[in-house]
Amino acid sequence: VSENESLARMGVASFLTKIDPTLEEINDIKTAVSEAVTNSIIHGYRDKKGIVEIKCHLRETIIEKEDEILHISLITIIVRDDGTGIDDIEKAMEPMYTSKPENDRAGMGFAFMQLFMDTVDVWSKPYIGTSVTMTKELKRIEKKGNNGCNNAD
């Protein structure tokens, strides 16, 4: 699990560098992706081999004002597997719920995804697979005449 999780985290961090996010923003998104990938491996494939697909999309909007430029980046990340699927998505998303209590799983994966991302949507069908779509909006303000950018709150 850890090698696949690390690869996913590095790939997503690499994707994010083009929009110059803060270290905290990168870590939040990497944590959410890590949880989604771990869920696919542990629960979707039940520790058997399988493919976990990660798609990253970026939509950028630039709004120019009198003395500043606002950069808005909407990041969408989709983590998909062809694993066993989830019978009850609502139950699976409850904090502390785990389908593998024997493995000392905390059942906090979806809770962490929801904490670190703006939206988390789950689609799943038993025996077909699961798709987790997460979004996060990042903003930064560039003062006109300033070569550097300042992140907005």
Predicted regions and their residues:
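STAS-typified acidic loop motif
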Residues: 1-5
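Loop/helix-junction capping segments adjacent to catalytic residues or to phosphate/diphosphate-binding pockets
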Residues: 6, 23, 86
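Generic recognition of short, well-ordered alpha-helical segments
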Residues: 7-10, 91
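Conserved short strand/loop->alpha-helix "switch" segment adjacent to the catalytic nucleotide/phosphoryl-transfer site
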Residues: 9-34
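Conserved polar catalytic motif of the HATPase_c/GHKL fold
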Residues: 35, 39
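Conserved beta-strand-loop-beta-strand hairpin that lines the nucleotide-binding pocket
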Residues: 40-153
